[in-house]
Curated annotation (Swiss-Prot):
SMART domains: BATS, Elp3. The lineage of its organism: Bacteria, Bacillati, Bacillota, Clostridia, Thermoanaerobacterales. This is Biotin synthase. It catalyses: (4R,5S)-dethiobiotin + (sulfur carrier)-SH + 2 reduced [2Fe-2S]-[ferredoxin] + 2 S-adenosyl-L-methionine = (sulfur carrier)-H + biotin + 2 5'-deoxyadenosine + 2 L-methionine + 2 oxidized [2Fe-2S]-[ferredoxin]. Homodimer. Gene3D superfamilies: Aldolase class I (3.20.20.70). Binds 1 [4Fe-4S] cluster. The cluster is coordinated with 3 cysteines and an exchangeable S-adenosyl-L-methionine. Binds 1 [2Fe-2S] cluster. The cluster is coordinated with 3 cysteines and 1 arginine. It comes from Desulforudis audaxviator (strain MP104C). Pathway: Cofactor biosynthesis; biotin biosynthesis; biotin from 7,8-diaminononanoate: step 2/2.
C-alpha cells in the first residue's frame, strides 16, 4: 500500500472500532508495523476512539511503595528481585500512619485513586496488616478509590480484600504468554491469570497490563493486548522498560518513541472501552513526545513517583492534560 492507501485503511479500521467491531490479531499487528510516516495519522484516529468511548477526562492514580525489595522472584526487568544487585530501596511494610499520611496527601491534590503496592511473590505474613490498613484507609480517607498490588493472591485472600473495602486489584500479565518464560522462571503466566480471575470473581475491578520493550516482538504486544481483552480487565497500565543497572535487562536497547506511541494507539483500538493508563518509563523513554500519547489514545496515568524510579510530578502531568484541553 502507498501512503494514501495506508491512511485510508487506518480510517476504515478506526471507524469499524467506533461502530462496535473488534480487530483481529492480523489487523492489529499490521497497524503496529506501520511506518513512522503514518504514525501521526494513526494517533489521531486512536484519539477519536478515546473521545468516543471515554470523553475528555483523564483518570489519575497514585501509588505508595509500601514494602520494598527482597522479592523471591526473578523477573528480569525488576530492581526489587533479591537475586539481582541493584540500588533499589529495601524495607518492610510501612506503618499504617505513614500510608494514611500519603493517602491524605494524594487526596489533597485532587487525585481520587490510590494504590498500595508491596514487593514479593505474594502478601505473605503481612496480609492481616494489609487488611487492617485497607480498612483504616476506607474509614479515614473515604473519598479515595482503593487499589492494591500485592502479587499472587488466592480466592480467599481476594474475598478478604474485597470485604475490607478494596475497590480494585492490580496484577500485570507483564508480557505475552509466548514470551513470559524469557521474562520470569519462578512462577507461571497461568499463576497471574488465576490471580486476575480470583479478583474478578469476588467483584473487584482489575487493573492489569504489562511492560513493553523487554525484547518481545511487536506481535507479542498484540498477543498481550488480546489476552487482556479476553480477560475483560477494567484498566490496562502500559509500562515501558526503564533499564536499571544490576538487572539482566540493564543493556536492553530502548524502543523508538514512535513505536511506543503506535503500541499505545493499537492498544486503544483493540481495547476501546478499557482504560489505557500511562505507567512507569514514559518520562524516560518518550521525553517530550509523551504528550502525543495523551493525544493518541491514552486516557489515564499514574502520577507522582513509581516504585523505584521518580516520575515528573503531578503538577507537570496536570499541565500536560490542560494543554490538550483535557480534564483530570
Amino acid at each position: 500500500m502507498n501512503l494514501q492507501e495506508k491512511t485510508a485503511w487506518i480510517t476504515h479500521v478506526a471507524r469499524r472500532v467506533i461502530d462496535g467491531d473488534t480487530l483481529s490479531f492480523e489487523e492489529a499487528t499490521a497497524l503496529l508495523q506501520l511506518p513512522d510516516a503514518v504514525t501521526p495519522f494513526l494517533l489521531g484516529w486512536a484519539d477519536v476512539v478515546r473521545k468516543c468511548f471515554h470523553g475528555n477526562r483523564v483518570d489519575l492514580c497514585a501509588i505508595v511503595n509500601a514494602r520494598a525489595g527482597r522479592c523471591s522472584e526473578d523477573c528480569r526487568f525488576c530492581t526489587q528481585a533479591a537475586c539481582y544487585h541493584t540500588r533499589a530501596p529495601v524495607y518492610p511494610l510501612l506503618p499504617a500512619e505513614g500510608i494514611i499520611r500519603r493517602a491524605r496527601a494524594v487526596r489533597s491534590q485532587g487525585i481520587k485513586r490510590f494504590s498500595l503496592v508491596t514487593s514479593g511473590r505474594d502478601p505473605g505474613g503481612d496480609f492481616e496488616k494489609i487488611l487492617g490498613i485497607t480498612r483504616q484507609l476506607k474509614r479515614e480517607v473515604p473519598e479515595l478509590k482503593l487499589c492494591a498490588s500485592l502479587g499472587i493472591i488466592s480466592p480467599t485472600e481476594a474475598r478478604a480484600l474485597k470485604e475490607a473495602g478494596l475497590d480494585r486489584y492490580h496484577h500485570n500479565l507483564e508480557t505475552a504468554a509466548s514470551f513470559f518464560p524469557e521474562v520470569c522462571t519462578t512462577h507461571r503466566y497461568e499463576d497471574r491469570v488465576a490471580t486476575i480471575r480470583a479478583a474478578q470473581k469476588v467483584g473487584l475491578e482489575v487493573c492489569a497490563g504489562g511492560i513493553i520493550g523487554l525484547g518481545e516482538k511487536p506481535e507479542q504486544r498484540v498477543e498481550l493486548a488480546l489476552a487482556l481483552r479476553e480477560l475483560g480487565v477494567t484498566s490496562v497500565p502500559v509500562n515501558i522498560l526503564h533499564p536499571v543497572p544490576g538487572t539482566p535487562l540493564a543493556t536492553q536497547p530502548p524502543l523508538p518513541a514512535l513505536e511506543i506511541l503506535r503500541t499505545l494507539a493499537v492498544f486503544r483500538l483493540l481495547l476501546p472501552a478499557t482504560t489505557i493508563r500511562y505507567a512507569g518509563g514514559r518520562e524516560h523513554n518518550l521525553r517530550d513526545t509523551q504528550v502525543l500519547g495523551l493525544a493518541g489514545g491514552v486516557d489515564a496515568l499514574i502520577t507522582g513517583d513509581y516504585l523505584t524510579t521518580a516520575g515528573q510530578g503531578t503538577a507537570r502531568d496536570r499541565q500536560l492534560i490542560r494543554d490538550l484541553g483535557l480534564e483530570g
